[in-house]
């Protein structure tokens, strides 16, 4: 096969067509995890999900918040993938389901601890000569 006829994988938003009407998980830039049925998308990878839930994980617990129809701006999508329903069930049954109202404060606390650890690690790395992303001396 010569270079002119070589098959190139389709990596634009058009590659989402295989996921339409399937259950997907979408991870957003802010860390939210959305699970729903992908109903539509456009050339900017803006997504429309139906029967959407936001799933919160904390340690060995999880909680779901019903979000219904959810529109996601494409630039906020970090990851999108089809869910294997059997594997999802097997994975979730190893966790304890909790009311999302109880998990939300715990998730916020975990997130703050994570940010604090990242800041401390950044300070240490800066003290030994490394540049920290987003720091005042980061010129990129």
From Swiss-Prot:
SUPFAM superfamilies: Sm-like ribonucleoproteins (SSF50182)
Matches recorded under PROSITE patterns: SM
Annotated Pfam families: LSM
Keywords carried by this UniProt record: Cytoplasm, mRNA processing, mRNA splicing, Nucleus, Ribonucleoprotein, RNA-binding
One of the protein's GO biological processes: deadenylation-dependent decapping of nuclear-transcribed mRNA
Cellular component, GO annotation: cytoplasm; cytosol; Lsm1-7-Pat1 complex; nucleus; P-body; ribonucleoprotein complex
Region feature (Confers RNA-binding specificity): 129-140
Subcellular location: Nucleus; Cytoplasm; Cytoplasm, P-body
Residues in Sm domain copies: 11-86
Keyword Protease annotated: no
A GO term for molecular function: mRNA 3'-UTR AU-rich region binding
Entry keyword annotation includes DNA damage: no
CDD domains according to UniProt: LSm1
UniProt family annotation: Belongs to the snRNP Sm proteins family.
Self-association state and partner proteins as the record states: Component of the heptameric LSM1-LSM7 complex that forms a seven-membered ring structure with a donut shape. The LSm subunits are arranged in the order lsm1, lsm2, lsm3, lsm6, lsm5, lsm7 and lsm4.
Protein name in the entry: LSM1-LSM7 complex subunit lsm1
Organism field: Schizosaccharomyces pombe (strain 972 / ATCC 24843) (Fission yeast)
